[in-house]
Amino acid sequence: MTQVLPSGLVASAVVAASSANLGPGFDSLGLALSLYDEIVLETTDSGLEVVVEGEGAGQVPLNSEHLVVRAIQHGLRAVGVPATGLIVRCRNDIPHSRGLGSSASAVVGGLAAVNGLVSQAGWVPLSDQQLIQLSSEFEGHPDNAAAAVLGGAVVSWIERCGDRADYSAVQLDLHPDIHLFSAIPEVRSSTAETRVLLPDLVSHDDARFNISRAALLVVALTQRPDLLMAATEDVLHQPQRASAMPASAEYLQLLRRHKVAATLSGAGPALIALTTNPDLPPEAVEYGAANGFTITAMTAGDRVRWKPGVAFSD
């Protein structure tokens, strides 16, 4: 007889937003940000109920197609135990379709919440490596997912063997002098829509340029933040995406003219700025506010947290 999770178990997870690429580190570098979603699960005898508060309420599906639900089912299959029924409550603060890793956070949060359930019933929770692998299988690349799992800054990579892709990541010790800012516009953009703007092939010169900058960025993030301007230069994806988000592209250039190491956050249209100054230049703040950007001082986000029982916010 197949074992199932008993009814009445409650678990929760809190997961951070993330910024991928950071300029040159396309699909490999990521940074968790101090903006969080919370997921609360409860097992029931049957059925599925999905409740969404905050970002996405009234817009995302409230059935088995919901990304968090799909991640939960993926995690339960990986552990090897089903649930006969679920109540899934999502409290979302991470903006959708802005380049802040909301989909990766949804997947990582759903998988982590599974750990809170199965740990109460005698099953071994998913490890960090399993969380990275399972969540990256949804995304197709591990940069956002790994940042959401591990917290802080990460370098991630893929090893392929035939049709299989193995996803891995290591965490970097972010230099304490680095200050983070997000600039989030009201407009939205989808990663799929902007990826079609990227060429299938790039020149050796462009590849060499980005390789050097991505390598330098690891040093800048951990040891030499004075190198952030040079280390965040990119020729592989940000110039190509500029036409799809002209306001973000213009603001990006303005920030960089003021010696702020700004990049697109993921596929945009949000921007992330890394600087050793505790404040952005007044001209940059004024321009952002006048052009529909919400500017927020951030810190590096924490690793995903899960626990059995009541919600973190209770």
From Swiss-Prot:
Q: Which UniProt keywords apply?
A: Amino-acid biosynthesis, ATP-binding, Cytoplasm, Kinase, Nucleotide-binding, Threonine biosynthesis, Transferase
GO MF, any single term:
homoserine kinase activity
**EC number(s) recorded for this UniProt protein:** 2.7.1.39
Pathway involvement of the protein, from the record: Amino-acid biosynthesis; L-threonine biosynthesis; L-threonine from L-aspartate: step 4/5
Localization, per the record, is:
Cytoplasm
A biological process (GO) of this protein is: threonine biosynthetic process
Recorded family membership: Belongs to the GHMP kinase family. Homoserine kinase subfamily.
Protein name in UniProt: Homoserine kinase
In its UniProt entry, the species of origin is given as Mycobacterium ulcerans (strain Agy99)
